[in-house]
Amino acid sequence: EYALLTGIPAPGFKATKSGETYDIKAYEEFCKAISQQIPNCKYIYIALRNVMSSEHHTFAGVLYSHGTMKYTRVFDIDNVIDCVGVGDAFCGAMLYAQHAYEDEQKRVDFSTADSVLKNTIAGDYNIVKVSEVEGLLAKHESGEVAR
């Protein structure tokens, strides 16, 4: 959506498994350009998805704020049940995290992990608990999702 709003082309996200890296520098430059066009925007969150098949996606998130970039590891979701509502889950978790956590890295980690879990739930509504999101962050350093 940022690319549509600003006319600035977004970098591609091509990670195919957990443990892969993605071009953080390109996303940082993208976010800097957005912040120049929209100077009153304090936080730029971006959810990143690559779809290998209907059941296999990778997912990550970035947050640009006050000239600094925070980013998550790549999550490998090989048991996607329903990807409808994943963006809504990301936004809802972002709003929750903005108020629940001081640390910006924790905010983007939480928002991303919440969205990752939503991929494993049928329907448009995300019904995961905060404890499930925090559990995914604590237990799955590899980025692979098992639910």
Question: What are the residue ranges of the model-derived segments?
Answer:
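Phosphate- and divalent-cation-binding pockets in alpha/beta enzyme and binding domains
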Residues: 4-5, 93
